[in-house]
Swiss-Prot record:
HAMAP family: His_tRNA_synth (MF_00127). Keywords: Aminoacyl-tRNA synthetase, ATP-binding, Cytoplasm, Ligase, Nucleotide-binding, Protein biosynthesis. Belongs to the class-II aminoacyl-tRNA synthetase family. The lineage of its organism: Bacteria, Bacillati, Bacillota, Bacilli, Lactobacillales. It holds the Pfam family HGTP_anticodon. It comes from Streptococcus sanguinis (strain SK36). It is an enzyme of class 6 (ligase). It catalyses: tRNA(His) + L-histidine + ATP = L-histidyl-tRNA(His) + AMP + diphosphate + H(+). This is Histidine--tRNA ligase. GO terms for biological process: histidyl-tRNA aminoacylation. PROSITE patterns: AA_TRNA_LIGASE_II (PS50862). One of its GO terms (cellular component) is cytoplasm. The gene is hisS. The keyword Signal does not apply. It comes from the Bacteria. Its EC number is 6.1.1.21.
Protein backbone atom coordinates (compact mmCIF):
# COMPACT_ATOMS: atom_id res chain seq x y z
CA UNK A 1 0.00 0.00 0.00
CA UNK A 2 1.30 3.41 -0.97
CA UNK A 3 1.12 5.66 2.08
CA UNK A 4 -0.46 8.98 1.19
CA UNK A 5 -2.38 11.71 2.96
CA UNK A 6 -6.15 11.09 3.33
CA UNK A 7 -8.46 12.50 0.66
CA UNK A 8 -9.43 16.09 1.35
CA UNK A 9 -6.32 16.94 3.37
CA UNK A 10 -3.09 18.69 2.45
CA UNK A 11 0.54 19.00 3.50
CA UNK A 12 1.48 22.65 3.97
CA UNK A 13 5.17 22.84 3.10
CA UNK A 14 7.52 25.54 4.46
CA UNK A 15 7.34 27.89 1.48
CA UNK A 16 3.53 27.80 1.63
CA UNK A 17 3.25 27.86 5.41
CA UNK A 18 5.08 31.20 5.45
CA UNK A 19 2.01 32.66 3.70
CA UNK A 20 -0.30 30.99 6.22
CA UNK A 21 1.70 32.44 9.10
CA UNK A 22 1.60 35.90 7.54
CA UNK A 23 -2.21 35.85 7.21
CA UNK A 24 -2.62 34.42 10.73
CA UNK A 25 -0.31 37.06 12.22
CA UNK A 26 -2.10 39.79 10.25
CA UNK A 27 -5.42 38.60 11.70
CA UNK A 28 -3.95 38.52 15.21
CA UNK A 29 -2.83 42.15 14.88
CA UNK A 30 -6.31 43.15 13.67
CA UNK A 31 -8.00 41.32 16.56
CA UNK A 32 -5.61 42.97 19.02
CA UNK A 33 -6.74 46.43 17.84
CA UNK A 34 -10.28 45.46 18.83
CA UNK A 35 -9.25 44.03 22.23
CA UNK A 36 -9.76 40.35 21.34
CA UNK A 37 -7.75 37.61 23.05
CA UNK A 38 -7.00 34.14 21.66
CA UNK A 39 -8.90 31.05 22.85
CA UNK A 40 -7.87 27.48 22.00
CA UNK A 41 -10.41 24.68 22.30
CA UNK A 42 -10.03 20.91 21.70
CA UNK A 43 -10.06 19.62 18.12
CA UNK A 44 -12.67 17.05 19.19
CA UNK A 45 -15.82 17.60 21.26
CA UNK A 46 -18.68 15.51 22.61
CA UNK A 47 -21.08 14.87 19.72
CA UNK A 48 -23.94 16.68 21.48
CA UNK A 49 -21.95 19.94 21.67
CA UNK A 50 -22.20 20.18 17.89
CA UNK A 51 -25.45 18.36 17.10
CA UNK A 52 -27.59 20.28 19.59
CA UNK A 53 -26.17 23.73 18.84
CA UNK A 54 -25.59 23.59 15.09
CA UNK A 55 -28.92 21.81 14.59
CA UNK A 56 -29.86 18.14 14.23
CA UNK A 57 -31.30 18.74 10.75
CA UNK A 58 -28.40 20.72 9.27
CA UNK A 59 -26.23 19.20 6.54
CA UNK A 60 -23.24 19.45 8.89
CA UNK A 61 -24.81 17.07 11.41
CA UNK A 62 -26.73 14.78 9.05
CA UNK A 63 -24.06 14.39 6.34
CA UNK A 64 -20.70 15.95 7.14
CA UNK A 65 -19.59 15.18 10.70
CA UNK A 66 -16.56 13.03 11.45
CA UNK A 67 -17.88 11.25 14.54
CA UNK A 68 -16.94 8.04 16.34
CA UNK A 69 -17.17 6.23 19.68
CA UNK A 70 -13.93 6.23 21.65
CA UNK A 71 -12.63 3.37 23.81
CA UNK A 72 -14.77 4.59 26.70
CA UNK A 73 -17.87 4.40 24.45
CA UNK A 74 -18.18 8.20 24.41
CA UNK A 75 -19.67 9.70 21.24
CA UNK A 76 -17.01 12.10 19.94
CA UNK A 77 -16.85 14.36 16.88
CA UNK A 78 -14.04 16.29 15.23
CA UNK A 79 -15.16 19.91 15.36
CA UNK A 80 -16.83 21.01 12.09
CA UNK A 81 -17.02 24.71 13.04
CA UNK A 82 -15.65 27.05 15.69
CA UNK A 83 -18.53 28.80 17.45
CA UNK A 84 -20.13 25.89 19.35
CA UNK A 85 -16.83 24.81 21.00
CA UNK A 86 -16.13 28.41 22.04
CA UNK A 87 -19.61 28.78 23.55
CA UNK A 88 -19.18 25.46 25.36
CA UNK A 89 -15.87 26.75 26.76
CA UNK A 90 -17.44 30.09 27.74
CA UNK A 91 -20.06 28.27 29.82
CA UNK A 92 -17.80 25.54 31.21
CA UNK A 93 -15.18 28.07 32.36
CA UNK A 94 -17.84 30.42 33.78
CA UNK A 95 -16.71 33.40 31.73
CA UNK A 96 -20.19 34.81 32.41
CA UNK A 97 -19.18 35.39 36.08
CA UNK A 98 -19.50 39.02 37.25
CA UNK A 99 -15.76 39.34 37.91
CA UNK A 100 -14.98 38.68 34.22
CA UNK A 101 -14.81 41.90 32.20
CA UNK A 102 -17.68 42.20 29.67
CA UNK A 103 -18.06 41.92 26.82
CA UNK A 104 -15.85 38.84 26.55
CA UNK A 105 -14.01 39.07 23.21
CA UNK A 106 -12.15 36.02 21.90
CA UNK A 107 -10.72 34.83 18.60
CA UNK A 108 -9.58 31.39 17.46
CA UNK A 109 -7.61 29.77 14.67
CA UNK A 110 -7.44 26.09 13.87
CA UNK A 111 -8.46 22.96 11.99
CA UNK A 112 -12.10 22.06 11.36
CA UNK A 113 -13.35 18.85 9.75
CA UNK A 114 -16.29 18.12 7.44
CA UNK A 115 -16.86 15.09 5.24
CA UNK A 116 -17.83 16.82 2.00
CA UNK A 117 -16.70 16.85 -1.60
CA UNK A 118 -13.23 18.45 -1.69
CA UNK A 119 -13.08 21.58 -3.86
CA UNK A 120 -10.87 24.63 -4.38
CA UNK A 121 -10.52 26.48 -1.11
CA UNK A 122 -12.52 23.93 0.89
CA UNK A 123 -11.10 20.58 1.99
CA UNK A 124 -12.26 17.96 4.50
CA UNK A 125 -9.72 19.30 6.94
CA UNK A 126 -9.88 23.06 6.62
CA UNK A 127 -8.68 25.93 8.76
CA UNK A 128 -10.80 28.68 10.19
CA UNK A 129 -10.13 32.06 11.74
CA UNK A 130 -13.02 33.32 13.84
CA UNK A 131 -14.07 35.82 16.48
CA UNK A 132 -16.82 35.72 19.11
CA UNK A 133 -18.11 38.45 21.43
CA UNK A 134 -20.29 37.64 24.47
CA UNK A 135 -22.31 39.86 26.76
CA UNK A 136 -23.50 42.77 24.60
CA UNK A 137 -26.92 43.10 22.97
CA UNK A 138 -25.97 46.54 21.63
CA UNK A 139 -26.31 46.62 17.81
CA UNK A 140 -23.00 48.52 17.80
CA UNK A 141 -21.36 45.17 18.69
CA UNK A 142 -22.70 43.63 15.47
CA UNK A 143 -21.39 46.59 13.50
CA UNK A 144 -17.99 46.48 15.22
CA UNK A 145 -17.73 42.78 14.31
CA UNK A 146 -18.52 43.59 10.66
CA UNK A 147 -16.11 46.57 10.70
CA UNK A 148 -13.32 44.37 12.09
CA UNK A 149 -13.68 41.90 9.21
CA UNK A 150 -13.93 44.74 6.67
CA UNK A 151 -10.76 46.34 8.03
CA UNK A 152 -8.91 43.02 7.85
CA UNK A 153 -9.83 42.53 4.18
CA UNK A 154 -8.95 46.13 3.27
CA UNK A 155 -5.63 46.15 5.12
CA UNK A 156 -4.42 42.78 3.79
CA UNK A 157 -5.25 43.83 0.22
CA UNK A 158 -8.35 41.85 -0.81
CA UNK A 159 -10.39 43.87 -3.31
CA UNK A 160 -13.94 43.82 -4.74
CA UNK A 161 -15.35 42.92 -1.32
CA UNK A 162 -19.14 43.07 -0.92
CA UNK A 163 -21.14 42.84 2.31
CA UNK A 164 -24.52 41.10 2.29
CA UNK A 165 -26.81 41.67 5.25
CA UNK A 166 -30.06 40.24 6.56
CA UNK A 167 -32.02 39.95 9.78
CA UNK A 168 -33.62 36.79 11.13
CA UNK A 169 -35.30 38.85 13.85
CA UNK A 170 -36.04 37.65 17.36
CA UNK A 171 -37.55 34.17 18.00
CA UNK A 172 -41.12 35.51 17.68
CA UNK A 173 -40.42 37.16 14.31
CA UNK A 174 -38.60 34.09 13.07
CA UNK A 175 -41.51 31.81 14.08
CA UNK A 176 -44.02 34.05 12.26
CA UNK A 177 -41.87 34.08 9.14
CA UNK A 178 -41.28 30.33 9.33
CA UNK A 179 -45.02 29.73 9.16
CA UNK A 180 -45.45 32.19 6.27
CA UNK A 181 -42.69 30.41 4.36
CA UNK A 182 -44.28 27.00 4.97
CA UNK A 183 -47.62 28.36 3.71
CA UNK A 184 -45.90 29.69 0.57
CA UNK A 185 -43.73 26.63 -0.18
CA UNK A 186 -46.17 23.81 0.62
CA UNK A 187 -48.14 24.16 -2.67
CA UNK A 188 -44.77 24.14 -4.50
CA UNK A 189 -43.37 21.12 -2.65
CA UNK A 190 -43.43 18.77 -5.64
CA UNK A 191 -41.21 21.16 -7.63
CA UNK A 192 -38.52 21.36 -4.92
CA UNK A 193 -35.35 19.27 -4.78
CA UNK A 194 -35.37 16.19 -2.55
CA UNK A 195 -33.20 17.97 0.05
CA UNK A 196 -35.51 20.99 0.12
CA UNK A 197 -38.61 18.80 0.42
CA UNK A 198 -37.04 17.36 3.56
CA UNK A 199 -36.01 20.81 4.79
CA UNK A 200 -39.54 22.11 4.32
CA UNK A 201 -40.63 19.79 7.12
CA UNK A 202 -37.59 20.28 9.35
CA UNK A 203 -36.16 23.76 8.74
CA UNK A 204 -37.94 25.64 5.94
CA UNK A 205 -35.63 28.68 6.09
CA UNK A 206 -32.85 26.50 4.68
CA UNK A 207 -34.77 26.19 1.39
CA UNK A 208 -33.98 29.88 0.78
CA UNK A 209 -30.22 29.34 0.49
CA UNK A 210 -30.40 26.18 -1.64
CA UNK A 211 -28.15 26.26 -4.72
CA UNK A 212 -30.40 23.91 -6.74
CA UNK A 213 -31.98 25.67 -9.78
CA UNK A 214 -35.50 24.33 -9.07
CA UNK A 215 -35.32 25.67 -5.51
CA UNK A 216 -34.01 29.04 -6.65
CA UNK A 217 -36.97 29.33 -9.02
CA UNK A 218 -39.44 28.35 -6.29
CA UNK A 219 -38.24 30.94 -3.76
CA UNK A 220 -38.17 33.87 -6.21
CA UNK A 221 -41.62 34.95 -5.11
CA UNK A 222 -41.21 33.94 -1.45
CA UNK A 223 -42.24 36.41 1.25
CA UNK A 224 -39.47 38.56 2.72
CA UNK A 225 -38.48 38.02 6.32
CA UNK A 226 -38.22 41.80 6.71
CA UNK A 227 -42.02 41.99 6.39
CA UNK A 228 -42.36 39.74 9.45
CA UNK A 229 -39.99 41.54 11.82
CA UNK A 230 -41.77 42.86 14.89
CA UNK A 231 -41.10 46.37 16.24
CA UNK A 232 -38.10 45.31 18.34
CA UNK A 233 -36.47 43.36 15.50
CA UNK A 234 -37.10 46.14 12.96
CA UNK A 235 -35.58 48.74 15.28
CA UNK A 236 -32.54 46.54 15.88
CA UNK A 237 -31.94 46.00 12.15
CA UNK A 238 -32.44 49.71 11.44
CA UNK A 239 -29.81 50.57 14.08
CA UNK A 240 -27.31 48.15 12.51
CA UNK A 241 -27.87 49.62 9.04
CA UNK A 242 -27.61 53.19 10.34
CA UNK A 243 -24.28 52.54 12.08
CA UNK A 244 -22.86 50.79 9.01
CA UNK A 245 -23.75 53.89 7.01
CA UNK A 246 -22.11 56.09 9.66
CA UNK A 247 -18.89 54.06 9.27
CA UNK A 248 -19.29 54.24 5.46
CA UNK A 249 -19.39 50.46 5.11
CA UNK A 250 -21.55 49.72 2.05
CA UNK A 251 -23.93 46.75 2.19
CA UNK A 252 -26.64 45.00 0.21
CA UNK A 253 -29.68 43.44 1.89
CA UNK A 254 -30.18 39.83 0.83
CA UNK A 255 -33.44 38.51 2.30
CA UNK A 256 -32.73 34.97 1.01
CA UNK A 257 -29.57 34.69 3.11
CA UNK A 258 -30.31 32.58 6.18
CA UNK A 259 -26.93 30.96 7.06
CA UNK A 260 -26.43 27.22 7.33
CA UNK A 261 -26.51 26.97 11.12
CA UNK A 262 -29.63 27.01 13.27
CA UNK A 263 -28.46 29.19 16.14
CA UNK A 264 -28.56 32.66 14.53
CA UNK A 265 -31.01 35.49 15.28
CA UNK A 266 -31.19 39.17 14.37
CA UNK A 267 -28.16 40.24 12.28
CA UNK A 268 -26.52 37.81 9.86
CA UNK A 269 -23.91 38.79 7.29
CA UNK A 270 -21.57 37.50 4.61
CA UNK A 271 -18.59 39.05 2.86
CA UNK A 272 -18.00 37.95 -0.72
CA UNK A 273 -15.42 38.81 -3.34
CA UNK A 274 -15.06 38.14 -7.05
CA UNK A 275 -12.48 35.64 -8.28
CA UNK A 276 -12.29 34.62 -11.95
CA UNK A 277 -15.83 35.83 -12.59
CA UNK A 278 -17.49 34.00 -9.70
CA UNK A 279 -18.50 35.16 -6.22
CA UNK A 280 -16.74 33.50 -3.29
CA UNK A 281 -17.83 33.85 0.34
CA UNK A 282 -14.80 34.80 2.44
CA UNK A 283 -16.47 35.49 5.80
CA UNK A 284 -19.83 34.73 7.38
CA UNK A 285 -21.34 35.36 10.77
CA UNK A 286 -24.11 36.81 12.84
CA UNK A 287 -25.79 37.12 16.22
CA UNK A 288 -26.74 34.13 18.40
CA UNK A 289 -28.40 35.34 21.60
CA UNK A 290 -29.82 31.96 22.66
CA UNK A 291 -26.76 29.74 22.36
CA UNK A 292 -25.11 30.35 25.75
CA UNK A 293 -28.37 29.54 27.58
CA UNK A 294 -28.75 26.46 25.36
CA UNK A 295 -25.44 25.22 26.79
CA UNK A 296 -26.65 25.71 30.35
CA UNK A 297 -25.30 29.20 30.95
CA UNK A 298 -27.30 32.33 31.77
CA UNK A 299 -29.10 34.28 29.04
CA UNK A 300 -26.14 35.89 27.25
CA UNK A 301 -26.11 37.68 23.89
CA UNK A 302 -23.38 36.72 21.42
CA UNK A 303 -22.16 37.64 17.96
CA UNK A 304 -19.33 36.29 15.82
CA UNK A 305 -17.91 35.35 12.42
CA UNK A 306 -15.70 32.76 10.75
CA UNK A 307 -13.29 32.97 7.79
CA UNK A 308 -11.79 30.06 5.89
CA UNK A 309 -8.01 30.37 5.78
CA UNK A 310 -7.59 28.27 2.63
CA UNK A 311 -10.15 30.42 0.85
CA UNK A 312 -8.46 33.65 1.99
CA UNK A 313 -5.14 32.39 0.62
CA UNK A 314 -6.82 31.35 -2.64
CA UNK A 315 -8.35 34.82 -3.03
CA UNK A 316 -5.06 36.59 -2.22
CA UNK A 317 -3.31 34.45 -4.84
CA UNK A 318 -5.97 34.88 -7.55
CA UNK A 319 -6.15 38.65 -6.95
CA UNK A 320 -2.37 38.89 -7.28
CA UNK A 321 -1.72 40.20 -3.76
CA UNK A 322 1.99 39.89 -2.98
CA UNK A 323 2.46 39.04 0.69
CA UNK A 324 5.58 40.72 2.13
CA UNK A 325 7.13 37.54 3.49
CA UNK A 326 10.72 37.76 4.75
CA UNK A 327 12.47 34.47 4.00
CA UNK A 328 16.02 35.73 3.34
CA UNK A 329 18.84 34.49 5.55
CA UNK A 330 21.00 37.12 7.23
CA UNK A 331 24.18 35.02 7.12
CA UNK A 332 25.38 31.89 5.35
CA UNK A 333 28.63 30.30 6.52
CA UNK A 334 30.48 28.30 3.86
CA UNK A 335 32.64 25.66 5.56
CA UNK A 336 35.86 24.30 4.06
CA UNK A 337 37.66 21.36 5.67
CA UNK A 338 37.09 19.17 8.70
CA UNK A 339 39.11 21.44 10.99
CA UNK A 340 36.57 24.25 10.46
CA UNK A 341 33.53 22.11 11.29
CA UNK A 342 33.34 22.74 15.03
CA UNK A 343 34.28 26.42 14.73
CA UNK A 344 31.55 26.93 12.09
CA UNK A 345 28.94 25.51 14.44
CA UNK A 346 30.14 27.80 17.21
CA UNK A 347 29.97 30.75 14.81
CA UNK A 348 26.39 30.22 13.59
CA UNK A 349 25.22 29.67 17.17
CA UNK A 350 26.79 33.00 18.20
CA UNK A 351 25.10 34.74 15.26
CA UNK A 352 21.71 33.21 16.13
CA UNK A 353 22.14 34.28 19.75
CA UNK A 354 22.51 37.86 18.48
CA UNK A 355 19.20 37.55 16.63
CA UNK A 356 20.43 36.80 13.12
CA UNK A 357 18.98 34.09 10.87
CA UNK A 358 22.03 31.98 10.09
CA UNK A 359 22.79 28.72 8.27
CA UNK A 360 25.95 26.78 7.42
CA UNK A 361 26.96 23.89 5.21
CA UNK A 362 26.73 20.43 6.80
CA UNK A 363 27.37 18.32 3.69
CA UNK A 364 31.13 18.89 3.13
CA UNK A 365 30.47 20.20 -0.39
CA UNK A 366 32.69 22.16 -2.75
CA UNK A 367 32.60 25.95 -2.28
CA UNK A 368 30.75 26.51 -5.56
CA UNK A 369 27.82 24.36 -4.35
CA UNK A 370 27.81 26.14 -1.00
CA UNK A 371 27.73 29.56 -2.66
CA UNK A 372 24.80 28.38 -4.76
CA UNK A 373 22.99 27.39 -1.54
CA UNK A 374 23.66 30.86 -0.13
CA UNK A 375 22.02 32.34 -3.24
CA UNK A 376 19.05 29.96 -2.99
CA UNK A 377 18.56 30.97 0.64
CA UNK A 378 18.79 34.65 -0.46
CA UNK A 379 21.53 35.13 2.13
CA UNK A 380 22.36 38.79 2.67
CA UNK A 381 25.92 38.12 3.83
CA UNK A 382 28.36 35.28 3.23
CA UNK A 383 31.23 34.13 5.45
CA UNK A 384 33.78 31.60 4.18
CA UNK A 385 35.42 29.65 7.01
CA UNK A 386 38.30 27.28 6.25
CA UNK A 387 41.28 25.92 8.15
CA UNK A 388 43.41 29.02 7.43
CA UNK A 389 40.66 31.34 8.75
CA UNK A 390 40.37 29.26 11.92
CA UNK A 391 44.15 29.48 12.43
CA UNK A 392 44.38 33.24 11.78
CA UNK A 393 41.13 34.11 13.55
CA UNK A 394 40.15 36.39 10.65
CA UNK A 395 37.52 35.92 7.92
CA UNK A 396 36.13 37.73 4.91
CA UNK A 397 32.47 38.77 5.16
CA UNK A 398 30.82 39.46 1.80
CA UNK A 399 27.66 41.38 0.90
CA UNK A 400 26.04 38.66 -1.18
CA UNK A 401 24.07 41.18 -3.24
CA UNK A 402 26.79 43.59 -4.43
CA UNK A 403 29.87 41.43 -3.59
CA UNK A 404 31.41 44.14 -1.34
CA UNK A 405 33.79 42.54 1.19
CA UNK A 406 35.38 43.36 4.53
CA UNK A 407 37.85 41.38 6.62
CA UNK A 408 37.15 41.11 10.33
CA UNK A 409 38.12 38.93 13.28
CA UNK A 410 36.01 35.98 14.40
CA UNK A 411 35.82 37.63 17.82
CA UNK A 412 34.22 40.74 16.27
CA UNK A 413 31.57 38.56 14.61
CA UNK A 414 30.82 36.73 17.83
CA UNK A 415 30.64 39.93 19.88
CA UNK A 416 28.72 42.33 17.60
CA UNK A 417 27.77 41.25 14.09
CA UNK A 418 25.31 44.14 13.79
CA UNK A 419 28.19 46.60 13.23
CA UNK A 420 29.58 44.45 10.41
CA UNK A 421 26.07 43.98 8.97
CA UNK A 422 25.57 47.76 8.87
CA UNK A 423 29.01 48.40 7.32
CA UNK A 424 27.98 46.12 4.46
CA UNK A 425 24.85 48.20 3.85
CA UNK A 426 22.15 46.30 5.79
Amino acid sequence: MKLQKPKGTQDILPQESAKWQYVEDFARKTFRKYNYGEIRTPIFEHYEVISRSVGDTTDIVTKEMYDFYDKGDRHITLRPEGTAPVVRSYVENKLFAPEVQKPVKVYYMGSMFRYERPQAGRLREFHQIGAECFGSSNPATDVEMIAMAAQFFKDIGITNVSLELNSLGNPESRAAYRQALIDYLTPLKASLSADSQRRLEENPLRVLDSKEPEDKAAVEGAPSILDYLDEESSAYFAAVRSMLETLQIPYVINTNMVRGLDYYNHTIFEFTTEVAGSQLTICAGGRYDGLVAYFGGPETPGVGFGMGLERLLLVLDKQGVELPIETALDVYVAVLGADANGRALELVQALRAQGFAAERDYLDRKLKAQFKSADNFKAKTLITLGESEVESGRVTVKNNHNREEITVSLDQIQENYQLIFEKLGF
